Amino acid sequence: MGGGGGTYIALSAMQAIPIGIPKLCLSTFATKDLTRQVGIKDIVLMPSVVDVAGLNNISRILMRQAAGAICGMVNAGKPKEKTSVGNIAISMFGNTTPCVEKCTELLKKKGYEVLAFHSIGVGGQTMEALIREGFFDAVLDITTTELADDLCGGICSAGPDRLTAAAQMGIPQVVVPGCLDMVNFGHLDTVPKRYQGRLLYSWAPDVTLMRTNAEENKVLGQSMAEKLNRSKGEVAVLLPLKGISKVSEEGGVFHQPEVDQVLFDTIKSHLNSKIPVIEMAVNINEETFEQKAVDLILAMLKK
């Protein structure tokens, strides 16, 4: 509970509290943009309406309701029965949705709970945080596009720690360079001037995709390999040679197989020889690729 200073202190402290433990902040700033302060945590913001400096007929009501709300969250408790054999994280994007949906369907049939994270920056950050909190048994990282945004200054960067949590925690992971053919920007007018002349595609009115080039793919491939080389647990890399997104398949606006090959070759040349690399002459959204990804992660989980 607080005004400006108190709110920032409270929200900062709440970052250390694991997801699932109730968190509520009654604040005069609750109607402001506190995106950065809330971050990836499950924090409930409640407007105080009046200043919290003293008690009055309005503040008494709202403080009582805030106390009731947090008590209600605590009393809700946790599910008593485990409803799945394990939890698997999976990353997705519009360009990899068919793949992720099929993988999810197949894994659910095996009794797993599958949680999808949209690779728009906060999605990757949240997934990494939950992995570190021990929430997941394995990761099917289909869509690693946030690495490209971090490299090129796109709007979907998840920061430098993307693709590190599973490696540090030692849980099984199958990694795919999904959507590393693109960097995300807002409206066409927001694309930095340094990228003028590059291949751009308007995915939506306020979403512009930029095709990654060979030089960027060298950096991305090396970065991915170096992060995976530090894995404490089992990891495999799965490469769809005929397209790493919907728009890079044959006939797609980003179809540049020679540029994708630079990415594949760089990953393979920098990856620890003990880490298996499976190459498939299919697009990322084809059924055989989806089945292979699921088979790999299930085989790891059985060990």
Model segments located where?
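A solvent-exposed, charged loop/short amphipathic helix patch at secondary-structure junctions
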Residues: 191-208
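Metallocofactor- and cofactor-centric catalytic cores in central/energy metabolism, strongly enriched
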Residues: 1-168, 173-176, 185, 198, ...
